[in-house]
Structures are given as C-alpha cells and as structure tokens.
Amino acid sequence: MMIVIDYDAGNTANVLRALAQVRVEARLSADPQEILAADGLILPGVGAFPTAMQELERRGLVSVIQQAVADGKPLLGICLGMQLLLESGLENGQSSGLGLIPGVCRRIPDQAGLPVPHMGWNDLQMQQSSALTASLEGQSVYFVHSYYTDVPEEYLDVTADYGLPIPAMIHRGSVFGCQFHPEKSGAVGLGILEKFKEYVYENTARY
C-alpha cells in the first residue's frame, strides 16, 4: 500500500487517479501510523512553500515523514512536494523544509520572453540516471511552477531548459522528486509512476 500524504495542498485526486492507472494500491492519509506503515509515500502539492510547511507542522507530519525516510521508506515529492524535500525555501521570506535533500528553493528569475510561472510542456535533459529516469532524454512533460530547486549536482538527475537549467528530477537515496506533474504528463508521467512502483516493491522485498 502506498500513501499519498494529505495536507490540503491540492491535486491529490489526479495523483490517485494516475496511480490507479498503473495499478498501484494507494490512498490519501494524514495518519502518522498509516504513513509509517506504508510501502511507499507520495508527497504531492501545489501552492506556497511556507504555507505547506506550516500545514505539515500543524498536522504533526514533518517528523513523521523524516522518520519514514530514516527507516528507508521510498518517497516521491511532486511539484511543491519536491520543493519541500529541500532544507529551505525563499518564498515570502526564508522557511525551513523537510531537510531530506540539501538545497534551497528559489524563485525563477525574470527573463525576457520567459514568463513566470514556468507553465506548459518542456523537454527533459538527462544529467545522471536514477531508478526513475530510464528513457527520459528529450521527452516532454508538463510544468506549472514559479520556484525551482537549487541543489548540488550530485542530486540532480534531469533538467529542463527555461533560460537556466531547471531541475526537473532530483534524488538522494530513496527520496525522489519531480518538479513537473507526472499525473498530467501522459504516458511519460505514468511511466515514471510505474518505475516508482517497481522501486517501492523491490525495496519492500528487501525487508
């Protein structure tokens, strides 16, 4: 069973629908015991970094997520969920993140002819491979975001060009992030969720 973490940050119905398409048994939950008992976790999200972290704190889920990862639980952050994986974010001041991947979430700089938010389809460029990134070079996926994850190169798997290399996928150990929306990215996005499913159940078999 996978748990989609519930913290009122939107797009959960689309994520659950996409997981069902790749035959993943999943449900939405904010229950700490269910999160800690899950085979894998998905942290979706749209909205503002500080508001999301405040809601995770209010629900007592920050330490729960950190404990689940420390226990070896695979975690996939999507869009805002990926940004929250970092140490901090600079939206409306500086806020602490989950601290699972080193880095800072920064606003995409204003550039001529490139509106912010970065919205729509963009092509992926491979930087290094991970369990989720096979056959992604040149594939097109759907983005909607105004902030990007500034992470050390060792955690950067895939980028998209938007005047600067925008981190599209990152990972550290069993923690993965997609800045784009796999649930809105057609067959390519479903393929990434399928790979996460395979990774989760390979991980489960080791315990």
Curated annotation (Swiss-Prot):
Its EC number is 4.3.2.10, 3.5.1.2. The active site is at C79 (nucleophile), H181, E183. Residues 1-206 form the Glutamine amidotransferase type-1 domain. Keywords: Amino-acid biosynthesis, Cytoplasm, Glutamine amidotransferase, Histidine biosynthesis, Hydrolase, Lyase. One of its GO terms (cellular component) is cytoplasm. InterPro entries: Class_I_gatase-like, GATASE, Imidazole-glycPsynth_HisH. Pathway: Amino-acid biosynthesis; L-histidine biosynthesis; L-histidine from 5-phospho-alpha-D-ribose 1-diphosphate: step 5/9. GO terms for molecular function: glutaminase activity; imidazoleglycerol-phosphate synthase activity; lyase activity. It catalyses: 5-[(5-phospho-1-deoxy-D-ribulos-1-ylimino)methylamino]-1-(5-phospho-beta-D-ribosyl)imidazole-4-carboxamide + L-glutamine = D-erythro-1-(imidazol-4-yl)glycerol 3-phosphate + 5-amino-1-(5-phospho-beta-D-ribosyl)imidazole-4-carboxamide + L-glutamate + H(+); L-glutamine + H2O = L-glutamate + NH4(+). It is found in: Cytoplasm. CDD domains: GATase1_IGP_Synthase (cd01748). GO terms for biological process: L-histidine biosynthetic process. Pfam families: GATase. NCBIfam families: IMP_synth_hisH. IGPS catalyzes the conversion of PRFAR and glutamine to IGP, AICAR and glutamate. The HisH subunit catalyzes the hydrolysis of glutamine to glutamate and ammonia as part of the synthesis of IGP and AICAR. The resulting ammonia molecule is channeled to the active site of HisF. Heterodimer of HisH and HisF. PANTHER family: IMIDAZOLE GLYCEROL PHOSPHATE SYNTHASE SUBUNIT HISH. This is Imidazole glycerol phosphate synthase subunit HisH.
